[in-house]
């Protein structure tokens, strides 16, 4: 289902994998406390990198707010910019892997 060489890990919380048909799969990583192993849950399948990037930034910012890593509008603005830039760089790496 996935092309193993075309995968990027984002913030140890999300993973993006390229499917055989070229679509992009957004996967949430979690920890099974009983089995003590990492679990993967597919959140969504995308054809558009822009829609995927938008959702990834949104999920990572929400995660930071939930974990109280940010507490002001200025911090929110700064974090959103940093995450968008970080994700764009990772997408470039993913595209390099896809075209390899």
Swiss-Prot record:
Pfam families: DUF5405. This is Uncharacterized 11.3 kDa protein in GpA 5'region.
